[in-house]
Amino acid sequence: MSHASDPKKAGAHGDKSLVVEHLRKEYVRGKAVLKDISFTVSGQSTTAIIGPSGTGKSTLLRCINRLIEPTAGRILVSGEDVCALKGTALREARRRIGMVFQEYNLVERLSVMENVLCGRLGYISPWRAWLRKFPQEDIDRAFDLLDMVGLADFARARADELSGGQRQRVGIARAVMQEPHILLADEPTSSLDPKTSVEIMELLRAVAEKRDIPVLVNIHDVTLGRRFSDRVIGMCKGEVLFDDVPSALQDDHLKQIYGGEEWLQ
């Protein structure tokens, strides 16, 4: 099954799309961490990226949201090449890229509500941001999102009072608060117990469907990735070795991606 990059096709979903074309990343010249990565995601889809540790999965997501600079290639978010942007234009483009982090990245001393409202910082003036003065419509939207993630009763609680699963729910609400065109999740379940991991993946899939945006999840748990995704991208040593629907992912593919058979036992 082919998933070739096609910006025109991606734009057919209200321009909420991500197109990665021939992406390459080198930290040391001549030694690529990402090698010629190309794919397109659009619409209300959930895509799982699997592969061994150190294979470039997190680097890929960090290139997409420009936390790090790609060495070559293009990354189009809603048809705009974010690799070509700088300054104000880049900051505005990054509003459209929601990010859920492995370690939550919450401001521990702030309340749950204040952390969710941080998702609007790119939309308000610097003085409003400094004083944490948000429009009432943003506050109303934040309450709605806390209800969506099951934390309506925790709005005034400090972030450092929450469990890991609750913190990740806040992180998801904060990312959705940006009104992103795409949502990236970097190992969102790696620090969570099995039950909470399932709940977080269910929530991410619900975000894709309810917000009509593509969700791209870097995940270490192959079973979870298969269960909650519409598509699986398998990576090894900076290259894409598999790109298809979950039902097509067989043990032979997993041996190729992860190397050897021991881990299948």
Swiss-Prot record:
Its main location: membrane. The keyword Calcium does not apply. It catalyses: phosphonate(out) + ATP + H2O = phosphonate(in) + ADP + phosphate + H(+). SUPFAM superfamilies: P-loop containing nucleoside triphosphate hydrolases. The keyword Cell inner membrane applies. Residues 18-262 form the ABC transporter domain. It is found in: Cell inner membrane. Transmembrane segments: none annotated. GO terms for molecular function: ABC-type phosphonate transporter activity; ATP binding; ATP hydrolysis activity. InterPro entries: AAA+_ATPase, ABC_transporter-like_ATP-bd, ABC_transporter-like_CS, ABC_transpr_PhnC, MetN_ABC_transporter-like, P-loop_NTPase. It comes from the Bacteria. ATP binds at residues 51-58. One of its GO terms (cellular component) is plasma membrane. Its EC number is 7.3.2.2. It is a peripheral membrane protein. Keywords: ATP-binding, Cell inner membrane, Cell membrane, Membrane, Nucleotide-binding, Phosphonate transport, Translocase, Transport. Belongs to the ABC transporter superfamily. Phosphonates importer (TC 3.A.1.9.1) family. Part of the ABC transporter complex PhnCDE involved in phosphonates import. Responsible for energy coupling to the transport system. The complex is composed of two ATP-binding proteins (PhnC), two transmembrane proteins (PhnE) and a solute-binding protein (PhnD). This is Phosphonates import ATP-binding protein PhnC. It comes from Nitratidesulfovibrio vulgaris (strain ATCC 29579 / DSM 644 / CCUG 34227 / NCIMB 8303 / VKM B-1760 / Hildenborough).
